[in-house]
């Protein structure tokens, strides 16, 4: 009798382990645009010497150069990570000879995955667009918007509404997408409440705007949006939405019940580097850090999810030159207002996280994710 019970228990344990291994894993790719080690370190010291990245199991380094330039832009680097090919700066979803290449998001869709994109830039910006667009000029937003309508992405969050419905060709892509089953919302509350499996959350007409406070730093107010004050209630405006929309999207993807791929971009870490603005940089990293915490909480509970956190490049050539641990204050200096060729870190947690240790080209991020999808 006891022997039979033990055998039955062993069978159940073996079955559960096998089921988990045979189930396709979820993929969460987080890109801190412009986020080098100094951006991370500055945020960490400003946050009582702590960051959610300390919970990750493995750390690697990625070489960010583009096909013909040591200093990449977000289009070339985004294409390398999304599609596994080096290309020229400003190019999305094409190899260096102009051939269309398939992204990891599209490959995941072919294998039955649900998909999502979230960005604190406009959703057609280079990093998110690298996962669905094939075009030779990253700033051709109106054509990229047309490609977005055909992407099949389940959920997307970001700015850029005007490229869909305020167009010279008079097309209303929002109406076209609505006719094809999409729902659109303009605030986090409606996004959280929606039951649609095809949902767009526009956070601004063009680029999202924020009103942030970094820890121990002063408030900074940014340029006003290009829409009237009476329209502000329809948009997120200056509120942070990355962590809240990520949590809501993970819940939505989980409820669908299929494996999923999601790319989450903290876009404005890069913008702060271009501005050489330490306060802005720290506040943007801290928002990204809060979002990492949300993602880790999901992955730890799910136990069948790979989380990869990396950057497309470093911006600003930032260096911490002085500071105090006692009051979490720091002082950065910048050597550039553009991108640099520094390697960037790759943090990994969860399913087959060990694949991402070491030093490698950024194209290997695609290859490693592909090996997980094709397991």
Name each model feature, range by range.
Residues 2-8:
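Sec-dependent signal peptide recognition
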Residues 126-132, 207, 212-217, 222-225, ...:
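Active-site His/acidic residue clusters
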Residues 308-311:
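Active-site neighborhood of phospho(di)ester-bond hydrolases with catalytic His/Asp-centered motifs
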Residues 75-77, 198-204, 256-268, 342:
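Short coil-to-beta-strand
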Residues 20-167, 171-193, 197, 289, ...:
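N-terminal catalytic scaffold of extracellular/periplasmic and nuclease hydrolases
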Residues 133, 140-141, 166-234, 238-241, ...:
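Glycine-rich ThDP/TPP pyrophosphate-binding loop and its adjacent helix/strand module
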